[in-house]
Amino acid sequence: METNCRKLVSACVQLGVQPAAVECLFSKDSEIKKVEFTDSPESRKEAASSKFFPRQHPGANEKDKSQQGKNEDVGAEDPSKKKRQRRQRTHFTSQQLQELEATFQRNRYPDMSTREEIAVWTNLTEARVRVWFKNRRAKWRKRERNQQAELCKNGFGPQFNGLMQPYDDMYPGYSYNNWAAKGLTSASLSTKSFPFFNSMNVNPLSSQSMFSPPNSISSMSMSSSMVPSAVTGVPGSSLNSLNNLNNLSSPSLNSAVPTPACPYAPPTPPYVYRDTCNSSLASLRLKAKQHSSFGYASVQNPASNLSACQYAVDRPV
């Protein structure tokens, strides 16, 4: 090899041997080359330099030079890459903004063809229009979130505050703290103020009289209900006077209380089964009942003449 030959020459020079010529044969690319080294100052310098700095292949030097040139180019380009390129801001005119806003109100997500038409109308590029719609949608979503947060913070919002009035304003005379301890007495209720009843000029305590039946009806029903129980111990004259009293009070009751249209049919006499074989026994029993209840049928006649609705009102449940 060439390096081995150079080492031998340098060793001979150091030992003081001065060879006339040294032949070194080495193979490279299937070729045999002959290298001659003569004893000259140039050869000695070259041998000494090759001892401390080994000789490199000429192809390697070219590769190193090309790599160094690339490194220098990269080092020169690094500062430019580190600097961030400044984007150019688009300044929209009032007409362009009006056109874009009108389109945004109609359609917040325009497609490619719509954006191209808007770009033609506004004299802008499609990319500028796309970026504007993207920013406008982000601003719209932010505003919607802020409005929802304000509604949640303020309850139902100012538009519902007028509909919901506090109870203290509606009933100023009613105390909510002591009502359970004092109880709902008639005196406490009479002193409280109720706007609903005051507007109608109605006393809350007198509402019971609006729905309660008249005293005459109740007394009439009581007297009529007590009659059958006391029939047996009362003579006939007293029963006749009581019957006359009922007859006198019934027309006055009908004239005082207006009776609505009765949905029930008038009462019909009950069906009585008559057996021809036992007619004699039935007639005897009927006569016996008539003698025992001497005035009872005349007392029940006024009640039987009433309709179904009047009978339901007169008779207690």
UniProtKB/Swiss-Prot annotation:
Keywords: Cytoplasm, Developmental protein, Disease variant, DNA-binding, Homeobox, Nucleus, Peters anomaly, Phosphoprotein
SUPFAM superfamilies cross-referenced by the UniProt entry: Homeodomain-like
Record-linked SMART domains: HOX (SM00389)
Basic and acidic residues compositional bias, start-end: 35-48, 60-73
Modified residues (Phosphothreonine): 90
Region listing for Disordered, in residue ranges: 35-99
Biased composition (Basic residues): 81-90
GO cellular component, one term: transcription regulator complex
Protein's name in the database: Pituitary homeobox 2
Source organism per UniProt: Homo sapiens (Human)
